[in-house]
Amino acid sequence: MSPLNVGIVGTGIFARDRHLPSYQEFPDKFKVIAAFNRHKAKALDFAKVADIPENKVYDNLDEILNDPHVDYIDALLPAQFNADIVEKAVKAGKPVILEKPIAANLDQAKEIVKIAESTPLPVGVAENWLYLPCIKIAKEQIEKIGPVVAFTHNSTGPFVTQNKYLTTTWRQKPEHIGGFLSDGGVHQLALVISLLGEFGSVSALTRQVRERSGADDIVFATVQLKNKEVIGSFTYGSAFGATEKSVFLKVYGKNGTVTVDLSDKKDPVVKVKLGGSAEDNGDEQIFKVDNDESFGVNAEFLNFHEAVSKKDKSLYLGTPRTAFHHLACVDAFLKSSAKNGDYVKIEQP
């Protein structure tokens, strides 16, 4: 089978530094053949790196969408433009994969879910954390400690003043709800929800620590899952002063605990302690997780390739409905904080 021809819409930092290398790693499956940026000079710069001929560089969105040689669209746009690109891509008969967050707000996200579920074309959200190898290992171990009772999630770290993504205007003045809370927080939510299930309601307090974040950049929340049998805490923010980077999810069951530790991206581990009491307390088991340098990006593209090539959208894991729930959790955090921590139910698409 010939590789799928990819049209890149939005040729910024992540397109160049992460999407393109992933595509180039699998030349038998993908070929980036076209690029769009409303500033054509930026598209031309990307084209040089991607080896795209100049006649396939566009500053008119309709032209790349209607290019008969493009098999699908990879859209890396500010979130407020995602609903528009989905509508236009589907109308042009093109599958489309979007960068997260799914949209700038829940109304736009609902529209994307509606369009995606009314077409046979694959429409996906590129949530790479859904594909982390640690998830499979952790799921197997969580089955051993059940029933699950509670969890603690923590993703905290120091503010990185040289963060290259802070230079982008759409992040400095975000139109998407929560700014960095939705831009980065949806990753953490993808991990927790993949392992434990959807959130039902939250009580949260959010704050803006750094002016450069453009919006609230930390959240401390308590959570009740949709099944109401599991409660937990969710903490996220990398806007603090000097501190260690700490990313972990600890799951408490009646018969033990499972901890997913991603603090060191290059050396993730899953830790397990089995036993039903202090007296019945087994030795800790540590499961090393294979290092994935792409941190799930390669796997998400291979999954989307499968869905497009087989013309079966059900094969793709990162559905708009799934991504909607992640954004809806951020929306609930913000609404709860505005009500001084009152419990808020997670909105449905």
UniProtKB/Swiss-Prot annotation:
It holds the Pfam family GFO_IDH_MocA_C. Present with 9600 molecules/cell in log phase SD medium. GO terms for cellular component: cytoplasm; nucleus. GO terms for molecular function: nucleotide binding; oxidoreductase activity; oxidoreductase activity, acting on NAD(P)H. Keywords: Phosphoprotein. It comes from the Eukaryota. One of its GO terms (biological process) is NADPH regeneration. The modification Phosphoserine is found at residue 2. InterPro entries: Gfo/Idh/MocA-like_OxRdtase_C, Gfo/Idh/MocA-like_OxRdtase_N, NAD(P)-bd_dom_sf. This is Uncharacterized protein YMR315W. Gene3D superfamilies: Dihydrodipicolinate Reductase, domain 2, NAD(P)-binding Rossmann-like Domain. Coiled coil: none annotated.
